[in-house]
Amino acid sequence: MAKNRFNQHWLHDHINDPYVKMAQREGYRARAAYKLKEIDEQDKLIRPGQVIVDLGAAPGSWSQYARNKLAQGKQRDAQREGGIDGTIIALDLLPMEPIADVHFLQGDFREDDVLHQLEGVLEGRPVDLVISDMAPNLSGVASADAARIEHICDLALEFAQNHLKPEGALLVKCFHGSGYSQIVEKFKQQFKVVAPRKPKASRDKSSETFILGRQLKHPR
């Protein structure tokens, strides 16, 4: 009975969520698009001509937002061919419905075949921005969840170290709680500028937060 009440309460909140309504109206696949939008508007992350990689992209709302931003850049420069001024590569273990002008690679980005496909799209270019809305399945056991969250962030940090240009940026989802300070410290070891971000679109009750790192300390 308690579980049913919880589900009904969640459904009521979801249906009445202004960001859910806005996402439906504006064609985004998830309300998460507005988290990236708010951070981007604050930090000017996405700019015309960039190479952007979206880790854990499904269902695709972050890639949709990035695509729309780069399409605006295309409109300002009618000389360019193609639909956007830049390149977006989305990766996920799960399948994802196609998004115009977005290269989708399904698989584990640590595996050689996926990395080979990625390098084929990059054509030797370094990445300007890595974005990650990845989150593990949480168990409710604090110590286990902290380890899973840290592992996800470690994967994004390693990917960024291997592919970002020196002045590039990494934005990842994280959660406040056990292990959070260790993740921030890892960002500080890797980036010159590190800042937490809690967009308004992130639900108040959620411990979800985002960490932004800019300018690699030890670029490869």
From Swiss-Prot:
Q: Which GO terms describe its cellular component?
A: cytoplasm
Top-level EC class: transferase
Q: What does the record give as the reaction this protein catalyses?
A: uridine(2552) in 23S rRNA + S-adenosyl-L-methionine = 2'-O-methyluridine(2552) in 23S rRNA + S-adenosyl-L-homocysteine + H(+)
Q: Which Pfam families match?
A: FtsJ (PF01728)
Q: Which domain of life is it from?
A: Bacteria
Task: Give the annotated active site.
Answer: K173 (proton acceptor)
The principal localisation class reads: cytoplasm
The family this protein is said to belong to: Belongs to the class I-like SAM-binding methyltransferase superfamily. RNA methyltransferase RlmE family.
Record function comment:
Specifically methylates the uridine in position 2552 of 23S rRNA at the 2'-O position of the ribose in the fully assembled 50S ribosomal subunit.
Say if the entry is tagged with keyword Methyltransferase.
yes
Species annotation: Burkholderia vietnamiensis (strain G4 / LMG 22486) (Burkholderia cepacia (strain R1808))
The residues that the entry says bind S-adenosyl-L-methionine are G60, W62, D92, D108, D133
Keyword field: Cytoplasm, Methyltransferase, rRNA processing, S-adenosyl-L-methionine, Transferase
Report the EC code(s) recorded for this entry.
Answer: 2.1.1.166
Family annotation (InterPro entries): RNA_methyltr_RlmE, RNA_MeTrfase_FtsJ_dom, rRNA-MeTfrase_E, SAM-dependent_MTases_sf
Q: What are the subcellular locations of this protein?
A: Cytoplasm
**Do you know which Gene3D superfamilies this protein is assigned to?**
Vaccinia Virus protein VP39
Disulfide bond annotation, renumbered to this chain = none
Which GO terms of the molecular function aspect are on file?
Answer: rRNA (uridine-2'-O-)-methyltransferase activity
Its lineage opens with: Bacteria, Pseudomonadati, Pseudomonadota, Betaproteobacteria, Burkholderiales
* Name of the featured protein: Ribosomal RNA large subunit methyltransferase E
